[in-house]
Amino acid sequence: CAHISPKTTPKVLQKFPKKYIFAFFKSNNIMSYIPVHPVNPKEEICYFNPSTPLNYILAFPISQIRVCYFSPTGGTLRVAQIVAEQLGEALQIPIKYHSYTLPSERRQLPTFADNELIIWATPTYAGRIPNKTLDFVRSAMNIKDLPCIAIVTFGNRNFDNALAELAALMRDGGGKLLGAAAVVTRHVFSEIIAIDRPNTQDLQQITAFGLQILEKLKRSDNLPFSIPGKENPTEYYTPLREDKTPANFLKAKPQCDLSRCNACGSCFSICPMDTIQNEMGKPIFNGICIKCQACRHICSQNAITFTDSDFLSHIAMLEKYHSSPQSSEFFF
């Protein structure tokens, strides 16, 4: 135990009465403490208050991590989990996940407690936040002075404006942005692009990013940092055919090979737009399709495919020009 004088007391400790004693601990390079309450100051007998969190040495006292994510095929969730679990283990606090992938999950906005660290994760669609989720994200971003982290994933082409757009929404919502990451994951359109991402190097970079976040959680004077891209973009990336001319597959929808389909029903419940209809156990694709590939990836029979010529030509373009490994990028 060590007595803390008024001159050396960190600002985050000054809310305690002067005659407190603090026990300090160091784990994973994170300094934490427990206030030890004097039962009788004259005799200097004291006890630990087990209900006091161990991380008040942080400039942002937090007791829970909240992960909000959109992840139709699971790649974005995996990246968010890696970051959250590293921070949760270091700080010894629980993690709560809030998916807004399915329509039913977007019917109610999340509410955030005053002691949470927010991690918001989304894939990049056409260089931005997926447009069908943008209104929800904007409305849900009421994070009032909470520390937060922005994460986007991208399929090895480019994250364009997605990360800057997400970070701006978090700042506009009142969040204290500590860091931002754009992480390469497998491109959901292709069977060959970035199929092993995130790889070992990505994981090492994510770990280093987490350590930087832990350091920033200890400071209240974090400086702002820049993120490439437009914070309020109005345009989306224009997909290209293999010959580099514009491709138009906005209305393209998957098809099901009924001879392969075993009527398992997995695809009905996984569509983020809820537009796959059940017709005698077989999927019928009606309504909006955002090309997330969730239905195709979950199909164990490889019965679901896309046959639109522009869409297939775009995949060929990606595989021809964007197969060379790109780097994940981190900002803090």
Give, region by region, the residue ranges found by the protein language model:
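Intrinsic disorder/low-complexity segments enriched in polar/small residues
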Residues: 8, 12-20, 27, 43-45, ...
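Short, positively charged and aromatic/hydrophobic N-terminal segments
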Residues: 21, 27-33, 47, 56-57
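FMN-binding flavodoxin-like domain, especially the glycine-rich phosphate-binding loop
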Residues: 33, 51-66, 73-79, 83-103, ...
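A generic structural signal for alpha-helix starts
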Residues: 71-74, 157, 262, 290
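Acidic, Ser/Thr-rich low-complexity intrinsically disordered segments
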Residues: 235-273
